[in-house]
Structure formats: structure tokens, C-alpha cells
Regions:
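Structured catalytic-domain cores with a bias toward divalent-metal coordination
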Residues: 1-404
């Protein structure tokens, strides 16, 4: 009976159906995925985002990748700077420039923008910090770029330090990117005297940027003003993250996960100030419930970027979660019938869109336990979270593609 009810509640996977399911047209529309790097899911994302750009006027596409590296991609899709190969190699973190789905998205954005005036072009943004699971970047790029921007536009006496002072305090970049620091807090330079002084200087530089707002906005373009604000958020966020890497308390990993998602949330809110944004990331970074993970230190929990943004934007934020049936090449086979994914797998469609209320009704109470994943890279949807999800995309089978 539940399956029959869901059959009547399933909608086509397209932009028009999605917008009709939402309570309001969101300023920030986020599509989550339960695993990374599968081109089946990336192709569906590309299809939906193209429709939302063309039919609903969204003008920024933001992905879970390095916000500074993403500037190269944005320059390419808006102006043609660089080659596609170059921006895929240098404009993405986490190795995601190698995914065919991401390459196809960038190629489409460039073609879409080529004959359009600036106001109609689609922008690209990374909204993650310059962070990897194994290490964090040096704050050098963000700090020196912010200092250079201010030094060219305000009285030198207002600057809290010289570029030479920053360079001396930063030291060699490999001190900051040491991969041993992720497992051993004693290897981190995040709480060294130099790092402490840099945190104060970064705060002073951001304060100067804000204090000079009337002058800087009057003498720069909107894009030129967005860039130093990004540098400021990234510099302070990275220095905060490095300080947490040096933490020896049991809360260390929870704090690091929370700080990463705080960087993400701040970047998303800044992008939303510019106009409607489409977002793609892991479900765990976009959900409204607390995110959880088991790591080498034990269980970790934190508020995701989606939870933080939702608390600020209300109905102007929408979260569309993705669920899937199988990833057979990763050992994820047909889901048990008593799980959320098992119920959806009984539907005839290869892909569909469902209102969360319909899913909750079909599952009934008490809701089933989450599906147990046989592969660490896939996180099934938690039925207990349905009340905080605006809509759900279900993909029956994720298949291996040549890029994998």
C-alpha cells in the first residue's frame, strides 16, 4: 500500500516539478548527494541546474570545492580566461576536476555565457575552504591578497602591518600544510606565537575593510568588492581552523568539522547577497539536522552549513536531499525492503522527485532505522530527518562511468 501511495506521489525529475513542491522560490536552493564522485549523480545535477538557470533565473552555481581555487573557474566561465584543461586541474580541490560531470558543467557554463551580457551570465563559486581531510592550506594567499587590496586603496598609516611583516610571520608554507598535523596536534603551528599574531592582524585587516566600506564601494566594482571580502573570510577562517588543529581536547574533530562548515555557510550567505544561488554538496553539509560521523577519535557531530544558512534565511533556503538504491561497483546492492531506500527502490522510475510529506506518510511511525551502508563512501538518508528536508530525489541505480 505504501508503494502504491508513493507511485501516485512521485513527480518527474525536472525544475518545474521541483519549484512546485517548494513552499517558496528559495534564494539559495541546495541539492545534496549521498556520495561523491559518481557521474550518474553529477549528470542529474547538471540537467536540473541547467533548467533552473534557464527557467528560474538562478545566476550562481556553487560547489563543495575550494573557494579560492574556484575563482579560476569563475573567470573562465565568465570571460574565457584559461583553457578548460587548466581550470579543471587548478580550479577544483579534492581531485574533483577529474570528474566528467564537473567538466561537463564548466563547459556548459562557458558556452551559456559566451554571447550573454555580464548581468545574464552564470557565475561559478567554490564555497568550501582551502581544506582537505588530510591538511589545511597556508593562510598566505588570502592574507596577502587582502593586504594588497587595502594597501592599494587606503592610507598606509591605517594598515595594521606591512607586507614584509606578514611574510615573516607566515614563514614557510609547508609549516602550515604539514599533513602530520591532522593526526598529531603537536605538529600544528596553529597556536604558535606567530599564528596568534596573524589572527590579530587578520582581524584588523577585515575591520579596516569594513571601516572603509563607503570609500571602497564607491571606487570599486561589485565584483572587485566581493573578492577582498572572500579573502578576509578565508584568512580568518583558516587561522581559526589551524588553531583548532593544535587542540588536544576530545572535542578537536567536532570543532574542526564545525569550523569547516562555518566557512561554507559564510561563503553561501555572501553569495546569496549577490542573487539566487544553486548549491551542490554532500547531504551532510546541507541538512538542517546535526551532522554526525565516526572518525578515529570516535563519534563527531556538528551543525552543517545548511543548518547555519537555514537558521539565517528561513524559507529562502531549500534543501533537496538525494537518495539512491544501488552502487554495485562499490558493493552497495539492492536495499533491504524495510528501509527508506528499499521502499523507493520498489518504484518503477529510474529517477523521481518526491515531496517529503509523501515520503513521511508512506513510511509511517515509527520510522525505520537508516539503511546500513557496506561502503564508507556512501551515507544513506536518515528517515528521522525527513521533516527537515524540502524534497527528495531518488536515483534507482548509480552505474560506473568511464571516468572511474
Amino acid at each position: 500500500m505504501a508503494t502504491d501511495f508513493l507511485k501516485d506521489s512521485a513527480h518527474p525529475f525536472d525544475a518545474d516539478s521541483l519549484i512546485r513542491l517548494l513552499p517558496a522560490r528559495p534564494r539559495l536552493l541546495a541539492l545534496g548527494e549521498p556520495t561523491h564522485g559518481e557521474d550518474t549523480l553529477l549528470d542529474l545535477r547538471n540537467e536540473l541546474f541547467r533548467q533552473l538557470v534557464e527557467q528560474e533565473g538562478y545566476r550562481t552555481i556553487a560547489l563543495e570545492t575550494d573557494c579560492l581555487a574556484g575563482l579560476l573557474v569563475d573567470e573562465h566561465v565568465t570571460s574565457g580566461a584559461g583553457t578548460l584543461d587548466e581550470v579543471m586541474e587548478h580550479g577544483f580541490s579534492h581531485g574533483w576536476g577529474a570528474f566528467t560531470g564537473n567538466r561537463d558543467l564548466v563547459r556548459w557554463m562557458r558556452a551559456h555565457n559566451e554571447e550573454r551580457p555580464p548581468a545574464e551570465r552564470v557565475r561559478f563559486a567554490g564555497f568550501d575552504g582551502p581544506l582537505e581531510i588530510t591538511a589545511a592550506a597556508s593562510p598566505r594567499q588570502a592574507l596577502t591578497a587582502l593586504h594588497s587590496f587595502l594597501a592599494a586603496r587606503v592610507d598606509a598609516d591605517l594598515l595594521p602591518c606591512t607586507a614584509e611583516t606578514l611574510d615573516r610571520l607566515l614563514g614557510a608554507d609547508d609549516r602550515w600544510t604539514n599533513p602530520d598535523a591532522m593526526m598529531d596536534p603537536a605538529q600544528s603551528v596553529g597556536r604558535s606565537p606567530e599564528a596568534g599574531e596573524l589572527r590579530l592582524l587578520a582581524d584588523d585587516l577585515v575591520a579596516l575593510l569594513d571601516a572603509q566600506l563607503p570609500h571602497l564601494r564607491a571606487t570599486t566594482s561589485p565584483d572587485a568588492w566581493d573578492r577582498p571580502r572572500l579573502y578576509g573570510r578565508t584568512a580568518t577562517g583558516l587561522l581559526r581552523y589551524h588553531a583548532a588543529m593544535a587542540d588536544t581536547s576530545p572535542a578537536r574533530m567536532s570543532r574542526l568539522c564545525a569550523l569547516r562548515d562555518l566557512i561554507m555557510a559564510q561563503n553561501l550567505l555572501a553569495l546569496a547577497e549577490r542573487g539566487p544561488v544553486l548549491v551542490h554538496a554532500h547531504n551532510a553539509h546541507l541538512q538542517r539536522e546535526k551532522s554526525t560521523m565516526r572518525m578515529w577519535q570516535g563519534p563527531v557531530e556538528w551543525w552543517s552549513a545548511g543548518a547555519l544558512v537555514s537558521a539565517r534565511l528561513g524559507q529562502q533556503y531549500a534543501f533537496v536531499a538525494s537518495a539512491l538504491g544501488t552502487i554495485r561497483h562499490q558493493g552497495v546492492d539492492t536495499p533491504p525492503p524495510d528501509t527508506l531506500e528499499g521502499l523507493l527502490y520498489a518504484l518503477p522510475e529510474d529517477r523521481c522527485l518526491l515531496a517529503t510529506a509523501a515520503l513521511a506518510t508512506a513510511l509511517g511511525e515509527p520510522r525505520p532505522a537508516p539503511r546500513v551502508s557496506p561502503w564508507f563512501g556512501y551515507a544513506p538518508l536518515d528517515p528521522a530527518h525527513l521533516d527537515t528536508i524540502d524534497a527528495t530525489v531518488f536515483v534507482r541505480d548509480v552505474t560506473r562511468t568511464p571516468s572511474h
